[in-house]
Design a protein with these regions (language model features):
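Class I SAM-dependent methyltransferase Rossmann-like catalytic core
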Residues: 1-5
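Conserved SAM-binding loop
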Residues: 8-106, 177-182
Length: 189
């Protein structure tokens, strides 16, 4: 019997103060490095995720980014994703979460929009980097992943709770998508 004891090395982009990468199945025992542009968050690597350092290329078994991609210009997201993919080893996985543009649009057009739509719009931010410059449909995410050389293995829309200042927590929707570098598409959820 062969036991794989190799420790995976994963990168969490924009981890802030609450890293989440170890919640990904199979990554529970991974060595997680964090990357953030804001040194005050105390990441392992201080860098702009739109310009990944060359020394990170082909290094990681996986990359996780929760609510990060929407902070880049819509016109640069394909370039940003390509940079992240360059940091993956062949067969490496990219997992991202982004706010659902479909959900935000429904809320904005409803008679009584949820206060949760504010943080997903282009308002309500806390620092110079916390600005949404893009929103995504699941269709657009699939296109971006495929263009970056990833085979989509999982894609789904989920509900989660978001805190809106002193107003409390409200339900919102986000898209989750996972792709693998250099393998054929496996399934659609």
């Amino acid at each position: 019997m062969v036991i794989d004891i190799a420790v995976k090395e994963v990168l969490e982009i924009g981890a802030n103060v609450h890293p989440q990468a170890k919640q990904i199945p199979g990554w529970e025992n991974a060595r997680v490095l964090t990357l953030d542009i804001d040194a005050e968050q105390h990441p392992d690597i201080v860098a702009d995720a739109a310009q990944m350092p060359l020394e990170l290329e082909n290094r990681f078994d996986g990359i996780f980014a929760s609510h990060v991609l929407e902070h880049f210009s819509y016109w640069k997201t394909d370039e940003v994703l390509s940079g992240w993919v360059r940091c993956l080893k062949p067969g490496g996985e990219l997992h991202i979460l982004v706010p659902s543009w479909e959900w935000a649009a429904r809320e904005v057009l409803s008679e009584r929009p949820s206060p949760a739509v504010l943080p997903h719009s282009f308002a309500g931010h806390v620092n110079q980097w916390d600005v949404h410059l893009a929103m995504f449909t699941m269709r657009k995410l699939r296109h971006l992943f495929q263009k970056a050389g990833l085979s989509v293995t999982h894609a789904k829309t989920m509900t989660y709770q978001i805190r809106v200042g002193d107003l409390g927590e409200f339900p919102a929707e986000e898209h989750y998508i996972c792709g693998v570098k250099g393998t054929p598409e496996l399934k659609k959820e």
